[in-house]
């Protein structure tokens, strides 16, 4: 767990800033956003605040019942909110394809894509597509989803003349990936699996994905940015696989952890704030640009991951 700072950075915000505070005065009316993992935690709060600012938010969720509860709660507080949900399981490539097909065929525009869903430090398990579950859910699912939605985002950007933004919710845990960064030849190696390093590997992949995506978007000459971020360590059901961590959180959590309102702040800042206009390929923490690791800025590693991911989704 990483304690956050209440000292304001150059953006004027800090780790104690909330999602409402970092978006104060911003009008997102007319924008459409997708938020994955929106049925709980920072995903639900991100959805609420984007809707509060006027955006039409599509929740990509595994649990449609939980999504309805989130939507009902938001509408109770914000009767004018525009919130919908489409079923999405990021660990299943078929589910990702189905979600993208349904959204793309709806004719809706897409201004903002927030790749937020994730699982943390779970025991070794393979996804339905025979990919290590954390890598499959946290990276590969979002990688495919982004690629499948990109044409719609490009069309929206051209027609609206508004900047599109892709936001990858990574983590400071990317600093604790395997020593080589991404173990391309051992993704599914159970014998050497470490649940925390595998989580770090998947979060490093989120950072590298945004960096390489930035390169492609600039080459295409489209007005879409891609950034990654650390939301801060908060109490969410990410910790459901680790009872020891849950116990520790109950004892000292309030001293070092953000609440959900603070945890969603950096996501909402990167997604909406005018200070971030034109900024791409950066890593943010506490609503400020933050330094990543040498692996996190490794252009060769980013390209290798991109090519590896393309080949992996093609095989499935």
UniProtKB/Swiss-Prot annotation:
Keywords: Calmodulin-binding, Chloroplast, Membrane, NADP, Oxidoreductase, Plastid, Plastid inner membrane, Protein transport, Transport. Substrate binds at residue 171. It is found in: Plastid, Chloroplast inner membrane. Part of the Tic complex. Interacts with TIC110 (via N-terminus) and with calmodulin in a calcium-dependent manner. Interacts with TIC22 during import into chloroplast. The N-terminus (1-10) forms an essential portion of the targeting information. It comes from the Eukaryota. This is Short-chain dehydrogenase TIC 32, chloroplastic. InterPro entries: NAD(P)-bd_dom_sf, SDR_fam, TIC32. The active site is at 193 (proton acceptor). NADP(+) binds at residues 37-43, 89-90, 116, 137. GO terms for biological process: protein transport. NADPH and calmodulin binding is mutually exclusive. Dissociates from TIC110 after addition of NADPH. Imported into the chloroplast in the absence of a cleavable N-terminal pre-sequence. Not imported via the Toc complex. Belongs to the short-chain dehydrogenases/reductases (SDR) family. GO terms for molecular function: calmodulin binding; oxidoreductase activity. The keyword NADP applies. One of its GO terms (cellular component) is chloroplast inner membrane. Its EC number is 1.1.1.-. Involved in protein precursor import into chloroplasts. Part of the redox regulon consisting of TIC32, TIC 55 and TIC62. Has a NADPH-dependent dehydrogenase activity, but only after preincubation with lipids. It holds the Pfam family adh_short. Residues 298-314 are annotated as: Interaction with calmodulin. CDD domains: retinol-DH_like_SDR_c_like. The lineage of its organism: Eukaryota, Viridiplantae, Streptophyta, Embryophyta, Tracheophyta. Its main location: plastid.
């Amino acid at each position: 767990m990483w304690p956050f700072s209440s000292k304001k950075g150059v953006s004027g915000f800090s780790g104690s800033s909330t999602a409402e505070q970092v978006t104060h005065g911003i009008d997102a009316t007319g924008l459409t956003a997708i938020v994955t993992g929106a049925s709980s935690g920072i995903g639900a709060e991100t959805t609420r605040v984007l809707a509060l600012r006027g955006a039409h938010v599509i929740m990509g969720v595994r649990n449609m019942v939980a999504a309805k509860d989130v939507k009902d709660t938001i509408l109770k507080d914000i009767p004018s909110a525009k919130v919908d949900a489409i079923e999405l399981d990021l660990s299943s490539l078929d589910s990702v394809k189905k979600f993208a097909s349904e959204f793309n065929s709806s004719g809706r525009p897409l201004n903002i894509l927030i790749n937020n869903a994730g699982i943390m430090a779970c025991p070794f398990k393979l996804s339905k597509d025979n990919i290590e579950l954390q890598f499959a859910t946290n990276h590969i699912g979002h990688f495919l989803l982004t690629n499948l939605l990109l044409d719609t985002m490009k069309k929206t950007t051209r027609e609206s003349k508004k900047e599109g933004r892709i936001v990858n919710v990574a983590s400071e845990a990317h600093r604790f990936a395997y020593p080589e960064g991404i173990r391309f030849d051992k993704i599914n190696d159970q014998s050497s699996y470490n649940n925390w390093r595998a989580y770090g590997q998947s979060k490093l992949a989120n950072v590298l994905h945004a960096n390489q995506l930035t390169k492609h978007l600039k080459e295409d000459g489209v007005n879409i940015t891609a950034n990654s971020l650390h939301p801060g360590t908060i109490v969410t059901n990410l910790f459901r696989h680790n009872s020891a961590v849950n116990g520790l959180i109950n004892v000292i959590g309030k001293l070092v952890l953000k609440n959900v309102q603070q945890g969603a702040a950096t996501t909402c800042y990167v997604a909406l704030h005018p200070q971030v206009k034109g900024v791409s390929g950066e890593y943010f923490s506490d609503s400020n640009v933050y330094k990543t690791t040498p692996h996190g800025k490794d252009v060769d590693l980013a390209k290798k991951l991109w090519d590896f991911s393309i080949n992996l989704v093609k095989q499935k």
